[in-house]
Amino acid sequence: MPTTFQEIPRKRPSTPLLDRAVTPVGLRRLGEAELETLADELRLELLYTVGQTGGHFGAGLGVIELTIALHYVFDTPDDRLVWDVGHQAYPHKILTGRREQMGTLRQKDGIAAFPRRAESEYDTFGVGHSSTSISAALGMAIAARLQGSDRKAIAVIGDGALTAGMAFEALNHAPEVDANMLVILNDNDMSISRNVGGLSNYLAKILSSRTYASMREGSKKVLSRLPGAWEIARRTEEYAKGMLVPGTLFEELGWNYIGPIDGHDLPTLIATLRNMRDLKGPQFLHIVTKKGKGFAPAEVDPIGYHAITKLDPLNAPAAAPKKASGPKYSGVFGEWLCDMAAADPRLVGITPAMKEGSDLVAFSERFPLRYFDVAIAEQHAVTFAAGMACEGAKPVVAIYSTFLQRGYDQLVHDVAVQNLDVLFAIDRAGLVGEDGPTHAGSFDLSYLRCIPGMLVMTPSDENELRKMLSTGHLYNGPAAVRYPRGNGPNAVIEKDLEPIEIGKGIVRRQGSKTAFLVFGVQLAEALKVAEKIDATVVDMRFVKPLDEALVREIAGGHELLVTVEENAIMGGAGAAVSEFLARENILKSVLHLGLPDVYVEHAKPAQMLAECGLDEAGIEASVRERMTLLAL
């Protein structure tokens, strides 16, 4: 296994065992003594595959042994295997008949970055967001019981995902219904416990064995006849285990806890899983793994190698020269946050486990006492911000659009109803590319504009983003600024912290007959099309409050209004324009351009925009078609 870039051979080595393990059926024909070699081959395969396509990397390297052991011991797909989030599922895809398709990973019309039910019968539950696996597996376990089936449901969840409240809701529920399921905690950060080594591995084999389980149940029946005897025995067992393993919390919830064991020790994994396969009721196995296992750079820098673009410099094609572009929108936000924090001591920054992605690293270093990473807990993040706002703080919640959906009730009930000063910096708005529909920010304008008192802004470039962040920070009430992934058009950024006038759009180009009303970063494409057809272009800037006076004026002087947004057309910014026109009894032809009523599948962002008709060519074609229909 290569441990550095320089050790990556130009020619892919042979993988005789992996060639036989095309599916779990072939895997189960291998002898146990061959599985260590298979693990080496699978790691190498993952290195080459992700090096070619890009994608999530470190997590998959860390679960090679676990993936092999699960498909070796359990009768998948009849036994239901649910991967939480899905970042670690590439080895699973390779072993379940998709090895030859891995070269299309995350590409248009290729296989998805996450498990998808439509892609394989081995993908029992579609994922992308975190902390859903235990609830899903619990539902599957209860359904199996109702159907008279003894199939097992297994959830694999990481220690990071276990921080979300939803995971604990399921952990609390499963023992109440005595679900026949197994939860595997993949502890790759050692945030819950340290690996206690061989003694813990040995203890896990004993405690998971059928002999121990039978003795335990037999003792329970005998001692239950003696007043207090079983309770004393239970506590003695708990204290003895507690001296070696950290499972008290899970035991108290009603789970049979085993571990922690070494997640890279295949013989121990297989023996323990075989034992636990035959146990009834809710079972909990705690394994400790190393993210990036087997590739030194990823082991040293697990955050940097969580996801990669191109890894193999020897085999990758030469990169095309990049077009000149401005800074990343997230970088503009991060710089503004530091500047405003220096000017306003009331500002605090909150993120649900997205410090690097949302560009809060500099803020966390400069203002550590005002920085709060609440982990994967979006609901808590929003209400935590609401509580701080009640006491005079000015919280800024930096969150991806797709994850704000998870805290929507808190946004409405805890922030908006109380009209609290919370600013939501909504990153990754619109189409995000290769991660596909689970990560797209397709709906935020629709679900935000219906909230009374909410200020909703859509910058068209980096400078407007900075201005709107200041506007939202100074606004009395809840505010949201949504901006896309990637780089801006290289606009000149004014470094002051002055707000802009709320609810006012700007006419960027004056034309005739046709007018573009643009909400967001498609302004540049609209301006290019407008030059060809002599159209007016308006940078609307505010979805709520809508600049109704400007819309009325533009409607009065043009025959066709074209709204443009990178959000679902249904209920979006364009819908706000049509609602206003209808309310004012203004009859005007309106063309809405935005995201269609489908989930846009993974591809390059440019390909996705073209598919939705939101690139220059698509916008021009749609507008010309409507103009022809209207004889303009």
Swiss-Prot record:
Biochemical pathway: Metabolic intermediate biosynthesis; 1-deoxy-D-xylulose 5-phosphate biosynthesis; 1-deoxy-D-xylulose 5-phosphate from D-glyceraldehyde 3-phosphate and pyruvate: step 1/1
EC class of the enzyme, as a word: transferase
Binding, thiamine diphosphate: H87, G128, H129, S130, G160, A161, N188, F295, E378
Reactions catalysed: D-glyceraldehyde 3-phosphate + pyruvate + H(+) = 1-deoxy-D-xylulose 5-phosphate + CO2
Cofactor annotation remark: Binds 1 Mg(2+) ion per subunit. Binds 1 thiamine pyrophosphate per subunit.
Gene Ontology annotations of biological process type: 1-deoxy-D-xylulose 5-phosphate biosynthetic process; isopentenyl diphosphate biosynthetic process, methylerythritol 4-phosphate pathway; terpenoid biosynthetic process; thiamine biosynthetic process
A single MF term (Gene Ontology): thiamine pyrophosphate binding
Chain residues that bind Mg(2+): D159, N188
Cited Gene3D superfamilies: 3.40.50.920, 3.40.50.970
Cofactor(s) needed for function: Mg(2+); thiamine diphosphate
EC numbers for this chain: 2.2.1.7
GO annotation, cellular component aspect: cytosol
InterPro entries, per database record: Dxylulose-5-P_synthase, THDP-binding, Transketo_C/PFOR_II, Transketolase-like_Pyr-bd, Transketolase_BS, Transketolase_C
Keywords: Isoprene biosynthesis, Magnesium, Metal-binding, Thiamine biosynthesis, Thiamine pyrophosphate, Transferase
Pfam families in the cross-refs: DXP_synthase_N, Transket_pyr, Transketolase_C
SUPFAM superfamilies with a match to the protein in the record: Thiamin diphosphate-binding fold (THDP-binding), TK C-terminal domain-like
PANTHER family the record matches: 1-D-DEOXYXYLULOSE 5-PHOSPHATE SYNTHASE-RELATED, 1-DEOXY-D-XYLULOSE-5-PHOSPHATE SYNTHASE, CHLOROPLASTIC
Reported function: Catalyzes the acyloin condensation reaction between C atoms 2 and 3 of pyruvate and glyceraldehyde 3-phosphate to yield 1-deoxy-D-xylulose-5-phosphate (DXP).
Protein family membership: Belongs to the transketolase family. DXPS subfamily.
Binding partners and assembly: Homodimer.
Protein name: 1-deoxy-D-xylulose-5-phosphate synthase
Gene source species: Pseudomonas fluorescens (strain SBW25)
Taxonomy of the source species: Bacteria, Pseudomonadati, Pseudomonadota, Gammaproteobacteria, Pseudomonadales
Gene field: dxs
